[in-house]
Amino acid sequence: MLGPRRKVPASTSLNNRSSSFTGHVRDLASDGRGVVTAPDGKVFLVAGAWLGEVVEVSPTGGKGQIGFGAVKTRLESASVRRQPPCRHHGFEDGQCGGCPWQFVDYPAQLSAKDQRVRAMCTQLDISAELIQPIVAAPGEGQYRNR
């Protein structure tokens, strides 16, 4: 028989949307959001966060074991970060959202895409010799179609 559930004070619970936390972006999700682990171990997907950055995250919701968050403060920025070239870029309601990585330089985008493809192929047991390099578009913004 299990004992009574231990209560966690609301002020320390990350389910409370007002509780922000600081974390290191350790990976990128398939949709382009940064993967940040909260101090309690819950994984958050954070739009606008890039590999290696340290960010203060404001939780915005979640589903099961995965939380969603927004960057409240960027404490350490990636060296590849830049001003997005498209005026429609952003993560707020009413902004396009079709090119989530425009805030980093194009070579960094290509490198991240290459790493994602290689990781997926490895999971599928596809030989690394069969994987071709990612091909850059002739013009950085000329291939997007959202």
List PLM regions with ranges:
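SAM-dependent transferase fold signal centered on methyltransferase-like domains
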Residues: M1-R146
